[in-house]
From Swiss-Prot:
EC number of the protein: 3.5.5.1, 3.5.5.4, 4.2.1.65
Protein name: Bifunctional nitrilase/nitrile hydratase NIT4
GO cellular component: cytosol; plasma membrane
Domain of life assignment: Eukaryota
Gene designation per UniProt: NIT4
Family the UniProt entry places it in: Belongs to the carbon-nitrogen hydrolase superfamily. Nitrilase family.
Compartments in which it is found: Cell membrane
Domain CN hydrolase, chain residue ranges per copy: 36-308
Temperature section of the record: Optimum temperature for both activities is 40 degrees Celsius.
Membrane topology of this protein: Peripheral membrane protein
Described purpose of this protein according to its UniProt entry: Highly specific for beta-cyano-L-alanine (Ala(CN)). Low activity with 3-phenylpropionitrile (PPN) or allylcyanide and no activity with indole-3-acetonitrile. Not associated with auxin production but may be involved in cyanide detoxification.
A Pfam short name: CN_hydrolase
Modified residues (N-acetylserine): S2
């Protein structure tokens, strides 16, 4: 069954009573080569079933490509799953056998990077000729990370971003990223990067991405509240960039049934069709115009045509790391090297360092 399609074509604004919809902006004036069709996917993980989730991702990617999309962005933790509502039976000073086994199952649903699932995602990007931004749960040994993977339209794995700051109970199941994975990739369709969920509220992280020249700012999230749109609009205006926010749309039946999986504090009031994550995915222009979404109705492919000329139009009067910055007053230093718990040095290296 095909997904609900929501497409915005902002490159040739129709006339209404003799006036353009957005009279201050001639969206048809851009060079056609600067138009990028982008899709954000709003759909649920197949929980605890990574192969089935990959199959679903391919179906959605195929449908987006058929609609002409060049860039497709998936939600936070789409592969591996966002364990909304689960406590892993944690309390301060207390763990349980079931909670430990819940983590074992969650760990088994995560993926290695690199690994066979990454190879399959690369093949998907190549097959459908799209740039792919995918939210995953990354497994490194026995530590998990909330991660975004990037692929180009030739199937090349470009790199990853690990969430710097998990929120609340996420910190008990996910590790922390570091400055070595805050990439912005310069591609033929624009400079692409990502920040995940509430780390989008971190001004220093956003500023680092602006300084790297980000043009298409991807924001995979798990926040479906209406206030999220205001945050995304602010980032688009602040950074003079397109913002593509992708969230899952989930009902209770998308998760395992109790007692295998319990929604803390609300399980008794939920029916199988109860919405537990309402989506709200959206695409916003550098001028703060909502091009598509927010969608709170169900699983959907939310698409818009991005006129990259809007970036210059927006930065005409506000370039946050350019003519609107004050480097003699404010500065930001970023440590981009990996932070490892253990570093091994050979005797030769130690001798060289002592000289």
């Amino acid at each position: 069954m095909s997904m609900q399609q929501e497409t915005s074509h902002m490159t040739a604004a129709p006339q209404t009573n003799g006036h353009q919809i957005f009279p201050e902006i001639d969206m048809s004036a851009g060079d056609s080569s600067s138009i990028v069709r982008a899709t954000v996917v709003q759909a649920s993980t197949v929980f605890y079933d990574t192969p089935a989730t990959l199959d679903k991702a391919e179906r959605l990617l195929s449908e987006a490509a058929e609609n002409g999309s060049q860039l497709v962005v998936f939600p936070e933790a789409f592969i591996g799953g966002y364990p909304r509502g689960s406590t892993f039976e944690l309390a301060i000073g207390s763990r349980t056998a079931k909670g430990r086994d819940d983590f074992r199952k969650y760990h088994a649903s995560a993926i290695d990077v690199p690994g066979p699932e990454v190879e399959r995602l690369a093949l998907m990007a190549k097959k459908y000729k799209v740039y792919l931004v995918m939210g995953v749960i990354e497994r490194e040994g026995y530590t998990l990370y909330c991660t975004v993977l990037f692929f180009d339209s030739q199937g090349l794995f470009l790199g990853k971003h690990r969430k710097l700051m998990p929120t609340a109970l996420e910190r008990c199941i996910w590790g922390f990223g570091d400055g070595s994975t805050i990439p912005v990739f310069d591609t033929p369709i624009g400079k692409i990067g990502a920040a995940i969920c509430w780390e989008n509220r971190m001004p220093s992280l956003r500023t680092a991405m602006y300084a790297k020249g980000i043009e298409i700012y991807c924001a995979p999230t798990a926040d479906s509240r209406e206030t999220w749109l205001a945050s995304m609009t602010h980032i688009a205006l602040e950074g003079g960039c397109f913002v593509l926010s992708a969230n899952q749309f989930c009902r209770r039946k998308d998760y395992p049934s109790p007692p295998e999986y319990m929604f803390s504090g609300s399980e008794e009031s939920l029916t199988p069709d109860s919405v537990v994550c309402a989506g709200g995915s959206s695409i916003i222009s550098p001028l703060g115009i909502v091009l598509a979404g927010p969608n709170y109705r169900g699983e959907a492919l939310i698409t818009a045509d991005l006129d990259l000329g809007d970036i210059a139009r927006a930065k005409f009067d506000f370039d946050v790391v350019g003519h609107y910055s004050r480097p003699e007053v404010f500065s930001l230093n970023i440590r981009e090297h990996p932070r490892k718990a253990v570093s091994f040095k050979t005797s030769k290296v130690m001798e060289d360092e002592s000289v």
